[in-house]
Amino acid sequence: FNKLIDEYNNNTIKNNYMDDIIEASKEYIKNHFSEDINVNNIASLFAVSPTYFSRLFKKEVGVPPVVFINKYRMERACSYFDETDFTVKEVAELCGYSDPFYFSKAFKSIVGVPPKEYRLRNSCKNSI
């Protein structure tokens, strides 16, 4: 019986630690999305392998970390387009992209429309 309790406690501690890693990594991504971050950087913060981190992240969050990073960056990009007059190049840089062309391709892939079209559609909504 004591062995079962010990095993339960060890599993609980392990699960809590894994939950902590995931929550801390999501917070890290949100605080550092404008920087050059990747799975290797994040995994090293928690002293785990990139493969293990990616598998754990996908299991807990539902998407791989790179998808989470890119989607979060695009959420922020949409906010910048909605709330500022920054150029596509400026928004790209603020969201961690050094190449505005690559940013535009990623934006269209995730959001569904190119950045300039997104801004036009939303400026119409905001002016009505």
Feature map (PLM): residue ranges:
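An amphipathic alpha-helical interaction segment
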Residues: 1-12, 50-52
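Conserved phosphate/pyrophosphate-binding and hydrolysis machinery centered on Walker-type P-loop NTPases
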Residues: 11, 15-19, 36-39, 46
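The cytosolic transmitter module of two-component sensor histidine kinases
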Residues: 18-22, 88
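Terminal helix-turn-helix DNA-binding modules in bacterial transcription factors
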Residues: 26-27, 31, 36, 40, ...
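Short coil turns linking two alpha-helices in DNA-binding domains
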Residues: 49-50, 98-99
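Short hydrophobic/aromatic patch on the recognition helix
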Residues: 52-53, 57, 102-103, 107
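…primarily DNA-binding HTH/wHTH and HhH modules…
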Residues: 105-128
